[in-house]
């Protein structure tokens, strides 16, 4: 269906953070897609950083990279995984970007001597960014998730901008979905609605009346409680949704559909709901995730393992690849700083597969190299991503080629054997933010390689986030000793994929395959890696 002008859905959160606004936003998008509407989702983040590219993963979780090279919030990963929509720079807006743009305009004299203020200048820029996606004329519905919690000082300009937009666009062209928490007090055995009432009251104080409430809860909500929330929050009873904890986030669209959330949204937007959604493929996927035939143990070796959100896309890629292989991937997060030669067997010996995760810097690097060595010498299926691939190269150089001091110039600029080196175009760059090799680039695979077999083609395009690369001066040494470069950029020759052909499954990628794995198209490398781990597990039993 193609509308002449898009409709807008705004998603806010109250009571507490981390309730799942991104999951609800993605679920609404998936349901509207199933009804024939073209949808996109954007995230407004209230922090003053320009983007999360320089944020510590412990502060923010994963930095998700889009096809066009934007470093964005991890919620954009949810959007793409749920819907297979390709996002871009325009899908993630921060307070930092807004203020930077307004200040740049002021310096250029575009405000003609006016006093630059939050209202109207900041709010006007926010509204412009919200409506930027509409200029593509590709979407029927634009969903905008407002980061943070209603009542936060940082979110106020965004809330005011939404109020103005709803007024300007008209009541039938926008809908406001508010996600809140219904806490359970174990001492009294009660579910409490007061925090939700106060959250809605805070919204009302800022001029916004929610159209739909989604109530996060650990326990089922009674019809009476939902009627109470509807009455005191001034929301239609059929627009109060229960979002109870479920075994997998991919079940949330199905839970929302059973409560007719998509029908309520379409009604609020004055859109027809004639096409019944076909969610059979999603239901089949969820059934596989919830009812695996087998379990497989795979280690994720990294230095941010205390916060799994730092590797969110990798984790979700394994869930999707597990479903394809009718198994559950049990991820074991192993801190690379705590791995050495004396304990690597204890930590990784029972694993059916080992993934060495991406990262930056010297901390934990020797533990990652030790994990690579264990996977290579014990013939355990291995996948190295970005720095993980570079660690595979370093390990091979040290222990097979005999270059004992081989490393990356990131770790030791004076090394005699820089098998990983700073990219030529990066050598004059000093700024940190947004200056890496980012976004999608083409890659040509060697026919017959494990990577080409996994993809089913030799021409691929994958997303990147790095400054360092394989040093091609050493390529002949590596290939003559058994590590092959089986993927390269067709324009520059930059090595993108390495393999050890006589190993059961040993693949390293300079790019990030996890960024392109979705429910509808689980990434072929993860699917092949999990299949190899299962095969290796079966061989050990024989």
Predicted regions located by residue number:
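C-terminal and late-domain segments of enzyme folds
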Residues: 438, 442, 446-542
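Flexible phosphate-sensing "switch/lid" loops adjacent to ATP/NTP-binding sites
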Residues: 1-330, 337-353, 360-361, 368-374, ...
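Active-site proximal loops enriched in glycine and acidic residues that flank catalytic Cys/His/Asp
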Residues: 13, 43, 217, 244, ...
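Acidic/polar loop patches that form or flank catalytic/metal-binding clefts of enzymes
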Residues: 274-277, 383-384, 403-409, 460, ...
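Cysteine-nucleophile active-site neighborhood
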Residues: 19-22, 26-30, 34-36, 347-442, ...
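Short beta-alpha connecting loops at secondary-structure transitions
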Residues: 59-67, 246-250, 356, 377-383, ...
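A generic structural signal for well-ordered coil/turn residues at beta-strand boundaries
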Residues: 5, 209, 236, 294, ...
